[in-house]
Amino acid sequence: MVKKKKKVFAFDIESNALYDDITKVWCIYIFDVETGERWGYRPHQIEDGIRKLTEADVLVGHNIIDFDLPALKKMYPSLINYHFNVFDTLCLSRYLKPDRIGDSPEYPKGDPRRGPRGHGLKQWGEFLGELKGDYGEQEEAWDAFTEDMFTYCEQDVNLTVKVYLFLCELTGFDPYDPPSLYWKM
């Protein structure tokens, strides 16, 4: 019997604030891990982006359990009223090496088990040779949607996919049929 591949979408959102302070989702960017198809949604298309997310069997992201999905649930409760199967790269990074310092002598330089200096997407980008970008370093950057913000969101998804594929290879997970957590709010 041939096992059906799961539809795995990596995604990210950008918003005007974090956690309880969020009042606006500016954009969503989605990447189909198998086909490489991409979809980007700007402020007037957020509901379309959420509907696209519902087509996935598994959602992949960096900190989606703690931020992205709760933010979407807060801002669009009528559209986020069911479960998702999720693979959070931040959670797995922390699980695999909770004391990650990056320069640990237990593994030689170049050994993939050595990992980045921390668990953040920026640290992973430095480790994998794909920089996250520097958008948003000024506080007012998140006050209004810009195309630079949209490009930053896209780059976060590109990097998240690289982290995801790296972690799948490291753990032996099939990136097209990954283990996932059941998430419901």
Swiss-Prot record:
Keywords per UniProt: DNA replication, Exonuclease, Hydrolase, Nuclease, Viral DNA replication
One BP annotation, GO: viral DNA genome replication
Q: Which domain of life is it from?
A: Viruses
- GO: which molecular function terms? 3'-5' exonuclease activity; nucleic acid binding
Pfam families for the chain: DNA_pol_A_exo1 (PF01612)
Q: Gene3D superfamilies of this UniProt entry?
A: Ribonuclease H-like superfamily/Ribonuclease H
Give the Enzyme Commission number.
Answer: 3.1.11.-
Which enzyme class?
hydrolase
Job of this protein? Probable 3'-5' exonuclease involved in viral DNA replication.
The protein in question is named 3'-5' exonuclease gp74
Q: Which organism is it from?
A: Escherichia phage Phieco32
